[in-house]
């Protein structure tokens, strides 16, 4: 039986419920500790997340981390990553509705991160962020944003962008175009029938 490392990315304090990942900043702005105490710790029934986690415990840990990140005002790049991992966990349960919900939330947080460039001090590049926005947009069938962001990734090849990601963007752009053409043919055939 293989251990899924994704289940253990979030650290949860068994005493107060504060949850975080290694991506969180160490800084707490004034009033944040009190807010975490009011929103989480005061309602927390002490229990630990040590030992083997189920997918449901992993989901609980990520949701707690997202709440803590929101209260702490972590960067959008951090919250986007938490939401994306929640989408993956729901995908593993074949819960399409929740998967799509968290993909959309993640995509929106990546767009915020991209627009204010809060990813600059991380390992993420603008090309990677644009690709993720494009791919999440494609998956939630927001083809307008998918096209826009894949096109931006592809345009970076003129300035020596990341070749592997540019190729991935081209593949996804072509896949999206083929899917949309197929849908258009199906609609046309239905209207002729």
Show the residue positions of the predicted features.
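N-terminal cysteine/histidine-rich coordination modules
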Residues: 1-38
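TPR/TPR-like (Sel1-like) alpha-helical repeat modules
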Residues: 107-111, 143-161, 174, 188-190
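Alpha-helical linker/edge segments of TPR/alpha-solenoid repeat scaffolds
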Residues: 93, 97, 132-145, 171-193
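Structural signature of alpha-solenoid helical repeat junctions
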Residues: 78, 98, 102-105, 118-126, ...
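Amphipathic alpha-helical repeat scaffolds of TPR domains
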Residues: 34-47, 56-64, 74-95, 124-139, ...
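TPR/TPR-like alpha-solenoid helical repeat scaffolds
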Residues: 121-132, 160-182
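Flexible helix-coil transition and linker loops at the boundaries of alpha-helical arrays
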Residues: 50-51, 65-79, 112-123, 158-162
């Amino acid at each position: 039986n293989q251990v899924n490392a994704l289940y253990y990315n979030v650290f949860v304090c068994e005493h107060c419920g504060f949850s975080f990942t290694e991506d969180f900043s160490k800084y707490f702005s004034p009033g944040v500790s009190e807010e975490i105490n009011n929103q989480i710790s005061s309602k927390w029934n002490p229990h630990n997340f040590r030992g083997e986690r189920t997918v449901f415990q992993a989901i609980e840990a990520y949701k707690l981390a997202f709440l803590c990140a929101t209260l702490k005002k972590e960067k959008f790049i951090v919250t986007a990553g938490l939401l994306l991992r929640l989408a993956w966990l729901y995908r593993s349960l074949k819960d399409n509705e929740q998967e799509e919900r968290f993909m959309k939330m993640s995509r929106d947080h990546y767009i915020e991160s991209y627009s204010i460039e809060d990813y600059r001090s991380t390992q993420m590049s603008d090309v990677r962020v644009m690709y993720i926005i494009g791919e999440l947009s494609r998956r939630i069938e927001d083809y307008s944003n998918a096209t826009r962001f894949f096109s931006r990734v592809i345009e970076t090849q003129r300035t020596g962008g990341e070749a592997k990601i540019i190729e991935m963007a081209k593949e996804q752009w072509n896949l999206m175009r083929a899917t949309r053409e197929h849908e258009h043919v199906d609609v046309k055939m239905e209207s002729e029938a």
